[in-house]
């Protein structure tokens, strides 16, 4: 049984939404690559949240690291351990840039509260909002994200019905009505001097 209210699951639920918003915001496309080993240090490996793969986009070839904090305040400055994580990722991927994306999502308590706040996809104060469908295959939850291009409740109802009909093996569990409270995207550059200064320690450990 999966605890869908834990902080870890919060990240699992909202990370794909963060990617959708990032792609929409920067007109790009994110590809997933799984775990990638460092060519020179096979014991080093990285699993980036994604890499920009849209060829004609200025961000092409840039890695993406996502955090969805639930309590920590977003300040635009990566914590030391996150910075180190991104440096290791860039070394394994042999990339020079990484976008550090932080998104803080809040949830409405009811559908009525969601509908009364602004229009379908924007709050009264101009923040993004939307809906996530939670479905279950009998063992674990899966999520379907209302496309950011949907702007009316009527469009949403059509999409929802089509989505549920397309997944007859899944059972609807609940809906999440969200809004994006805070978003920060900071460019982190690869620091070869730092890596070269500490890489000797890898031999001491391995």
Indicate residue ranges for each PLM-predicted region.
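Accessory terminal regions of nucleic-acid processing enzymes
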Residues: 1-206
């Amino acid at each position: 049984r999966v605890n869908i209210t834990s902080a870890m699951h919060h990240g699992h639920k909202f990370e794909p939404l963060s990617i959708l918003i990032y792609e929409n915001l920067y007109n790009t496309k994110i590809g997933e690559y799984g775990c990638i080993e460092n060519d020179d240090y096979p014991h080093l490996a990285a699993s980036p949240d994604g890499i920009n793969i849209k060829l004609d986009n200025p961000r092409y070839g840039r890695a993406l690291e996502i955090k969805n904090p639930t309590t920590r305040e977003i300040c635009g400055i990566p914590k030391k351990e996150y910075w180190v994580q991104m440096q290791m990722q860039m070394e394994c991927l042999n990339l020079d840039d990484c976008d550090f994306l932080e998104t803080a999502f809040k949830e409405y308590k009811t559908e009525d509260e969601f509908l009364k706040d602004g229009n379908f996809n924007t709050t009264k104060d101009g923040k993004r909002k939307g809906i996530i469908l939670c479905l279950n295959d009998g063992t674990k939850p899966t999520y379907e994200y209302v496309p950011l291009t949907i702007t009316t409740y009527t469009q949403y109802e059509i999409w929802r019905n089509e989505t549920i009909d397309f997944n007859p093996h899944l059972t609807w569990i609940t809906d999440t009505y969200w809004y994006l409270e805070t978003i920060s995207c900071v460019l982190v550059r690869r620091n070869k001097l730092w890596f070269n200064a500490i890489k000797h320690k890898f031999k001491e450990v391995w």
